[in-house]
Each structure stands twice: as structure tokens, then as C-alpha cells.
């Protein structure tokens, strides 16, 4: 997962104004003030969030390094060894980050998180707007299975019935041919069913492995301590920047 930052000044152009929604949000904003824009994307290129803020309205306290919001709506955590403005994060933002990147460690300080991964049900896989060819293949195979299964059963029954009739009239060659045809028919049907079932099971297993629900496990005592240190670090950084400006 990556974050891209840019500063929008009046009359300036940059590469983050590609989508129509993004342009609309910029047009509706106050163009007389510079804006701070952050886009958070996963490794597969999927846009997770876009944050647009005026530079003059940034919070003085600690903010989430993913969504760049303060701790008013949700408590900020410091689950890793990162300090300063990169040391605090929302629990839900970090869980979404870890789920999208399919990792369990901080990509900056490489601290391992204590997480619990829960697999998602099959219904979410069917509703997932992923690759459409996989869903089309699944739909076609289900239709073929519903059509071929009764057809194979009826054909096998007719072949066995014909072989029985030929045996009664001492036509052993025709009876053996019908029995061989029945065996070949059911062999092809079983092989096709097993191959199709295995293919879709592999697709579901891969999706289930990379789309798990991540729950971050952090003790309350550690949360309180790390939040205090992160807040002090942000205050020191702000104080140092004020002295530099003066």
C-alpha cells in the first residue's frame, strides 16, 4: 500500500486529478486556499481513500497516518515503533490496510502486529466485484452442470437398458459396445466435474487467503502509553517547526 501527497495551489496542475469525482471535489472546494491532498492505494492499485484538506485547517494534535484525520471520531493508536506524525493510526484504518496488503507488520519499522485473521464467507466471494471472467466461468460451469447431469443420467440409463435388451437376444457385441459407451460417458462426466470443481475451489481459496478480515489485538495499557508518547512527539515537532519559522 502506498500514499501519494501533493499540494494544490491556485492555478497549479498535478497528476492526481484523473478521476471525475476527484475533479468535482476540487471544483466545489475553496480555490482561494491551498489544499493538502492525500490518496491511499493498495498494492493492486485500488484506491482506498482520498483526503482533501485546506492547509490552514490541519489539526495541531496527532493524526492518523492513513486517513490524516484526528482522534475525534475514533481513538488513535500507536501499535508499532514509528514516532512523530507516522506513529499514530486508527484501528479500523490499520485493519483495512493490513487486509488489503495481506501483511501483518508495519511497512516502515517492520514491527509485527498481533492480529487475528478471519476468513470471509462464500457469499462475499460471489458478491465481490473482482475479475468478471471468473464469475462468468463459474456461471457457465453451473449451467453446464445442471444441463449435463440429467442428460448424462438419462443417456447412461438408456445405454444400459439397450445393452440388457441385446443380451436377451444374444447380441453380445452390441451389448458390450453400449456398456463401453456408458463407461466412457460417465468417465468424461466425472473428470469434467472434478476439474471444474477443483478450478473454482482454487479461485475461492486464493480469494479467501488474500481477503481475510483482520482484527488488530492491542492491550489497553500499551495503547495508552504509546498514545501519550506520540502526542508528546507531535508537540515537539510542532514546537521545532515554529522556532524554525521565527
From Swiss-Prot:
Zn(2+) 2 binds at residues 80, 82, 106, 109. It is found in: Endoplasmic reticulum membrane; Lysosome membrane; Endosome membrane. The chain crosses the membrane at residues 138-158, 175-195. Its main location: endoplasmic reticulum. It catalyses: S-ubiquitinyl-[E2 ubiquitin-conjugating enzyme]-L-cysteine + [acceptor protein]-L-lysine = [E2 ubiquitin-conjugating enzyme]-L-cysteine + N(6)-ubiquitinyl-[acceptor protein]-L-lysine. Zn(2+) 1 binds at residues 64, 67, 90, 93. A zinc finger (RING-CH-type) spans 56-116. InterPro entries: Znf_RING-CH (IPR011016), Znf_RING/FYVE/PHD (IPR013083). Keywords: Endocytosis, Endoplasmic reticulum, Endosome, Lysosome, Membrane, Metal-binding, Transferase, Transmembrane, Transmembrane helix, Ubl conjugation pathway, Zinc, Zinc-finger. GO terms for biological process: endocytosis; protein ubiquitination. Signal peptide: none annotated. The keyword Repeat does not apply. Its EC number is 2.3.2.27. GO terms for cellular component: cytoplasmic vesicle; endoplasmic reticulum; endoplasmic reticulum membrane; endosome membrane; lysosomal membrane. Pathway: Protein modification; protein ubiquitination. The keyword Hydrolase does not apply. The RING-CH-type zinc finger domain is required for E3 ligase activity. This is E3 ubiquitin-protein ligase MARCHF2. It comes from Xenopus laevis. The lineage of its organism: Eukaryota, Metazoa, Chordata, Craniata, Vertebrata.
